[in-house]
Amino acid sequence: MVQLSGEEKEELCLKLASHLPRIRELLNVTQKEFGELVGLSTPRISVIENGKFTMTWAQFTSILFICACNMRTKEYVYANEILTGKLLQYLQRKDDNIPPMVNITVNVEMLDQYRTV
């Protein structure tokens, strides 16, 4: 089965945190409203966004779930390689040679617009 090391999980958490302001912008929500969606306090969202606290894996999966439920943020996390094939294989408990069983529908024209440097 595909595994993610603690270091890989932490890298994903840090990467997602760096994109949270843009994700909130795409959802058109404040830190408070976003916190209510993902089950975190406004101060916790703030320190995660400012890099003063590394989100937990449970917080990562909660935020990723909200992103996956919204077309714009789903495209955004896909375009910025936060939602990857390996992550999906891990979450679905797949072997390395078995692709994830997810149909990720995206608007291809929008992917370049969402990609960050």
What are these regions (language model features)?
Residues 24, 35, 64:
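The alpha-helix within a helix-turn-helix
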Residues 72-117:
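Short, charged recognition helix plus adjacent turn
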Residues 2-10, 31, 62, 75:
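Recognition helices and adjacent regulatory flanks at domain boundaries
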Residues 20, 31, 42, 57-60:
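Helix-turn-helix DNA-binding elements, focusing on the entry/boundary residues of the two helices
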Residues 28-47:
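Short alpha-helical DNA-recognition segment
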Residues 55-79:
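DNA major-groove recognition helix of helix-turn-helix/homeodomain DNA-binding modules
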Residues 1-26:
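A short, Lys/Arg-rich alpha-helix, primarily the initiator
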